[in-house]
């Protein structure tokens, strides 16, 4: 069952992508009974849906979109042994005491340990220079603190400079025998605008040095503005979802979506049509293949996502699953775009 507010364009697009997943699976012989309910923000709307007799027999429910519906829907799912896939909200505590919940949009702090591990494995020979933002980015304090600890424990050198440090100071921090990573302590666009000019000069003046910029998921929303710089600065960022118009799977999906619906997906990150497809395909394929044994076989679910990857981990013995999948996206100096998948 899908429970979504269809007065929200994003949810309509999610549903459209989901239908494409259902169609793909039906073509391979999978039988699916799909129930779709328009669930607006009133609690009476949710209650009337949950009162329907067929709801108790669902194998999986996708939704809700509204924060206030999560608790009652999660309680219903738990009572009736139904998997609940929450694709949108990341600010949800229900997953910690409900074994039936799958949280797709992971709280950032859960991803940090994955990012640190991938970074130190991928770049054991790194020299990290943190560029301290003039304005503290509260969202990144925990990330930077954990990163410093992790790098320290792996013997990777870390230095902190002000974001407005002159090129000479940046140059003095370089190690010629290492991969030099500049990591700002803020993920916002203003910080990028401040640091890119100095780093660009540094790279041009020191062509022999191995210099990279490393950052955050939100950078994909600014890619259009900084594409040239991202390539020149050999940039990486981490994210649990990523797509671009150059990847074959994305091109195919976008063309099919256009053909089905005679429109483009909205320009936002993540793209909701792709999110609908990826979540629908993963869980419906998994249930058709493994049925009630799905949870035991999650690691065997080897699918190439269009945008959102999945790597589910139970949060504790009595809780549900969070998605700990992380990609690194790399803009190389050769103008290549590479999605690094670590699994």
PLM region descriptions:
Residues 1-343:
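Extracytosolic ligand-binding ectodomains
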